[in-house]
Swiss-Prot record:
Principal place of residence: cytoplasm
Keywords (A to Z) from UniProt: Cytoplasm, DNA-binding
Oligomer status and interactors: Homodimer.
PANTHER family, sorted: NUCLEOID-ASSOCIATED PROTEIN YBAB
NCBIfam families in alphabetical order: DNA_YbaB_EbfC
The protein, known as: Nucleoid-associated protein Ava_2322
Pfam families, A to Z: YbaB_DNA_bd
Organism: Trichormus variabilis (strain ATCC 29413 / PCC 7937) (Anabaena variabilis)
Upper lineage: Bacteria, Bacillati, Cyanobacteriota, Cyanophyceae, Nostocales
Keyword Cytoplasm: yes
One GO cellular component term noted in the UniProt record for this chain: cytosol
Job description of the protein: Binds to DNA and alters its conformation. May be involved in regulation of gene expression, nucleoid organization and DNA protection.
Subcellular location, record wording: Cytoplasm, Nucleoid
Top-level taxon of the source organism: Bacteria
Length: 115
């Protein structure tokens, strides 16, 4: 070890980088809080059967409502069940993709030194 006050190899430049990283991390945390609120308010539509069944979920996959066309009811219980399931999957896939995109936007440019 050298006795030049460098401690654990953490010079002033590294401290500055680390402080900047903490600042960015704090911004990301604040952005994540806003994003969570935004996702809760969002309405994402999943459909099946050409719109016979629609499922609306929030950006974080919370079910909001289901709309079933009278024409879908005439299809019988088994087909209706399949349509609801397909619409739910569609809504889930779309909301997951939306959440992933928003998180990537939020964390882009976040580079932590030494990691």
């Amino acid at each position: 070890m050298t006795g030049k006050g460098q401690g654990f190899g953490f010079g002033l430049g590294k401290m500055k980088e680390l402080a900047e990283a903490f600042k960015k991390a704090q911004q990301v945390q604040e952005g994540a809080k806003r994003l969570q609120e935004e996702l809760e308010q969002m309405e994402i539509l999943g459909e099946a059967g050409g719109g016979l069944v629609k499922v609306i979920v929030s950006g974080n996959q919370e079910p909001k409502r289901v709309e079933i066309s009278p024409d879908a009811l005439a299809q019988g219980a088994d087909l209706l069940s399949d349509l609801v399931t397909a619409a739910m999957k569609d809504a889930y896939i779309k909301s997951t993709a939306t959440m992933r995109e928003r998180m990537e936007d939020l964390t882009s440019g976040l580079e932590l030194p030494g990691f």
